[in-house]
Amino acid sequence: MTLNQSIDAYKEAVDLMPGGVNSPVRAFKSVGMNPIFMKEGKGSKIVDIDNNEYIDYVLSWGPLILGHSDERVVKKLQDITAKGTSFGAPTLLENDLAKLVIDRVPSIEMVRMVNSGTEATMSAIRLARGYTDRDLILKFEGSYHGHGDSLLIKAGSGVATLGLPDSPGVPENIAKNTITVPYNDTDSLKLAFENYGDRIAAIIMEPVCGNMGVVPPKDGFLQYVRHITEENGSLLIFDEVMTGFRVGYHCAQGHYDVTPDLTCLGKVIGGGLPVGAYGGKREIMEQIAPTGPIYQAGTLSGNPLAMTAGYETLSSLSEESYEDINNKVDTLVNGFRDAADKFDIPIHINRAGSMVGVFFTDEEVINFETAQTSNLDYFAQYYRSMVNEGIFLPPSQFEGLFLSTAHTDDDIEKTVKAIHKAFEQIEK
């Protein structure tokens, strides 16, 4: 495999964009490679500018649950683009997607469309503060909720990959309004509420952490979070930008049967186009302008292209779709474990729906601290070997793999063979 054109493209890109990329994790720094530049994708496959084909487990970092260039989505996008890309006025397409979201997400009675997951979480935080008339927000260490100032505190994802505890440029007077505690730790959460309970506007959390790898909740943890917020008059915000329509047909909240006050969505609901949304109880959502005093707006919010791609994507998913993906995930996870046993590689695997986290450690991974016990050198060796075998994975230990309805049994078989080869070659 050669990557000469990607190397040349990156040399040009570093003079044009900071680090040569528009999102830090794409720089491939933690795996010791230059970025791979892609040009097209179809189904479960993606092709780089050197014409190397890969089985793709990045899927644009999660949105493409139907795979690349799904014919149903592409056809509808072609039709709507010919009619106009944005109007700055309401369209029926917004109603259509809103109805689907409200129907499938247990917590959402009303929804507001925005343009990114970061916009959704920032807006939900403002809404929670305005609704409760409190300032403090509680989040969990290693959880990434976008790059808004109040949420970029002890974040995971790209921040973890780059080894930064937080980001310069976040003022202390903003950071002090964010409390962090370890994920899956009820004792720390209880203590935080004993100290600050009457000042906490909301807990914002990923019901399954996806930006420290993949870390599901312990049994009863989400139920405890729901209980303690209700007990203290705080709101519970589920950041389901990643888990929404990935963990299940009714999102993670449906799977775990825990209903938050507000939910943030993104990724899958845009079918690969820029999108975000936040929604929840009617009495809370009606506090947003123009019906209420809490302001939020967006020039391209609810634009026809994103609404169309989102509607077609969600309309194409059924309960059976998730059963099929989960069966393929089972096979893939078993392949990882068999290879680890055969070549004596320490691994811990977490999964939630079509999300899979692979950690090179003997420890059970239940939070950010235990996620960081993963052997990053092993991960980098494994990653480079998988790329050479035509398997495209997220270039970070702290991101999960994603599967789609387009992945085939043959894709999984080829991937498992590549895993065996990669694990055999790891230098201990």
From Swiss-Prot:
Its main location: cytoplasm. Its cofactor is pyridoxal 5'-phosphate. Gene3D superfamilies: Aspartate Aminotransferase, domain 1 (3.90.1150.10), Type I PLP-dependent aspartate aminotransferase-like (Major domain) (3.40.640.10). Its EC number is 5.4.3.8. Pfam families: Aminotran_3. Keywords: Cytoplasm, Isomerase, Porphyrin biosynthesis, Pyridoxal phosphate. One of its GO terms (biological process) is protoporphyrinogen IX biosynthetic process. The keyword Disulfide bond does not apply. The keyword Cytoplasm applies. One of its GO terms (cellular component) is cytoplasm. The modification N6-(pyridoxal phosphate)lysine is found at residue 267. It is found in: Cytoplasm. It catalyses: (S)-4-amino-5-oxopentanoate = 5-aminolevulinate. GO terms for molecular function: glutamate-1-semialdehyde 2,1-aminomutase activity; pyridoxal phosphate binding; transaminase activity. It comes from the Bacteria. Pathway: Porphyrin-containing compound metabolism; protoporphyrin-IX biosynthesis; 5-aminolevulinate from L-glutamyl-tRNA(Glu): step 2/2. InterPro entries: 4pyrrol_synth_GluAld_NH2Trfase (IPR004639), Aminotrans_3 (IPR005814), Aminotrans_3_PPA_site (IPR049704), PyrdxlP-dep_Trfase (IPR015424), PyrdxlP-dep_Trfase_major (IPR015421), PyrdxlP-dep_Trfase_small (IPR015422). Homodimer. Belongs to the class-III pyridoxal-phosphate-dependent aminotransferase family. HemL subfamily. This is Glutamate-1-semialdehyde 2,1-aminomutase 2. It comes from Oceanobacillus iheyensis (strain DSM 14371 / CIP 107618 / JCM 11309 / KCTC 3954 / HTE831).
